[in-house]
Amino acid sequence: MTYQEALALVRTEFETRKMTPNCEVIKTNRTLDGCHSFPITLYDRGDEIILNDLGDTKEVFFEVEHAEWQELCETHGFEFDHWRIIRPFKGMQDLYDFIDFLDFIADRFDPLDEDY
């Protein structure tokens, strides 16, 4: 699948906003903490198309250590590279999984949760 084909597929369900010629922000109606929208981008690396959070998730949950991020990502089938959550995009299920993972992160590290 080309980047343009992937982008057209994503746009069948979500609005996007161009950041650069090879990167689009995917708009969802979800937030990490009530203020920060889910940071999901579709990015063309040239050799593959990926979903990427641009490292913004760790900026919201800054108290979470690198090792914990690494473990969470590996456990749930994501890459964690240079503080970025990454997953290759092969189809819409990858995007749904990315959204579900960010939902999981938002619930796990909810700053309003007294147990956290």
What is the role of each PLM region?
Residues 1-49:
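N-terminal ordered "arm"
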Residues 10, 59, 108-112:
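Generic ordered-secondary-structure signal
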Residues 79-116:
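Solvent-exposed, charged helical/coil patches
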Residues 6, 10, 14, 40, ...:
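Extended hydrophobic/Leu-rich segments
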